[in-house]
């Protein structure tokens, strides 16, 4: 991974300066890294991952959110249970956004975004397959609601946002 130490990322700087801004997270933010097969090391437990990553993250940044399609990607019960705890605590530390929140006009707009974005992914809206569904549906929802920030450790959403003008995804204002 290449890290630019000369230029400050304006989106990151904005979020650090105002940690209450709405930031959508991809599922990979909630899944412990597992390099046990590659490096012959013990897999990172969810308990340890939660302690050193999720608790500090959700404590410091109060505007964190996920789309329902990302929530559906959580396979491990421990991850879903933790997300449920964070959405139901007072004050809530995580918000789940649902497509049911959209008006009829917003649904039509979301479908347009889905079709524009899906052609650059492995997601097929007709089949509603799992591959890239979370990213495509999250970004589409965000575009309709004009949310700016999506955090992921995945090349697809980064490319869809960074190259929005060239790919004609309609995500030009996102970071």
Predicted features along the sequence, with ranges:
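Active-site-proximal, substrate-binding regions of enzyme catalytic domains
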Residues: 2-146, 155-175
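Conserved SAM-binding loop
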Residues: 150-151
């Amino acid at each position: 991974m290449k890290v630019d130490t000369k230029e400050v990322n304006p989106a990151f700087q904005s979020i650090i300066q105002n940690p209450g801004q709405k930031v959508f997270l991809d599922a990979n933010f909630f899944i412990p890294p597992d390099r046990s097969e590659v490096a012959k090391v013990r897999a990172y437990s969810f308990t340890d991952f939660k302690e050193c990553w999720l608790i500090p993250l959700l404590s410091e940044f109060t505007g964190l959110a996920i789309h329902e399609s990302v929530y559906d990607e959580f396979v491990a019960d421990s991850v879903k249970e933790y997300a449920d705890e964070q959405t139901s605590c007072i004050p809530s530390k995580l918000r789940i956004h649902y497509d049911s929140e959209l008006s009829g006009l917003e649904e039509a707009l979301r479908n347009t975004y889905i079709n524009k974005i899906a052609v650059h992914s492995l997601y097929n809206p007709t089949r509603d397959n799992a591959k890239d569904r979370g990213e495509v549906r999250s970004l589409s929802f965000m575009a309709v609601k004009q949310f700016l920030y999506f955090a992921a450790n995945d090349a697809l959403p980064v490319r869809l946002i960074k190259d929005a003008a060239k790919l004609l995804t309609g995500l030009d204002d996102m970071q």
